[in-house]
A protein has these predicted regions:
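Short, surface-exposed beta-strand/loop "edge" segments at domain boundaries and coil↔beta transitions
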Residues: 11-19, 72-79
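Short solvent-exposed strand/turn elements
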Residues: 57-79
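A generic structural signal for short beta-strands and their flanking turns/coil linkers
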Residues: 24, 43-45, 61-63
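Polar/charged side chains located within well-ordered beta-strands of beta-rich proteins
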Residues: 6-7, 51, 65
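Short, basic/aromatic beta-hairpin or loop at an interaction surface
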Residues: 1-12
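Acidic surface patches and DE-rich sequence motifs
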Residues: 10, 29, 55-57
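Short beta-strand-centered aromatic/proline hotspots
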Residues: 39-54
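Short coil-to-beta transition motif at edge beta-strands of beta-rich domains
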Residues: 18-40
Length: 79
């Protein structure tokens, strides 16, 4: 029996369970929930999924969504 889990991995290396499946270039909030576009303001804390990896451990398959934090200039194009 194989267990499947999903994690979001923050730029500092911390991680938490992902609330849902994500895609490359998807914008998410600090809890891993997708943000609705257009954004209300560029002054929010947002991350972008830039890489997805899968690793196998004993009896478990872990999908990791690696995030990068977006700055004000990056977020302005989503407003």
């Amino acid at each position: 029996m194989t267990l499947y889990s999903e994690r979001i991995v923050f730029p500092e290396g911390d991680w938490q369970e992902a609330p849902c499946r994500l895609k490359i270039d998807q914008l998410v909030d600090p809890n891993g929930y997708p943000l609705k576009l257009p954004l209300p303001s560029p002054r929010i804390l947002a991350f972008r999924v830039f890489r997805i990896t899968t690793k196998m451990e004993t009896g478990e398959e872990i999908r990791c969504y690696h995030l990068e934090q977006l700055n004000l200039l990056d977020l302005e194009e989503y407003v």
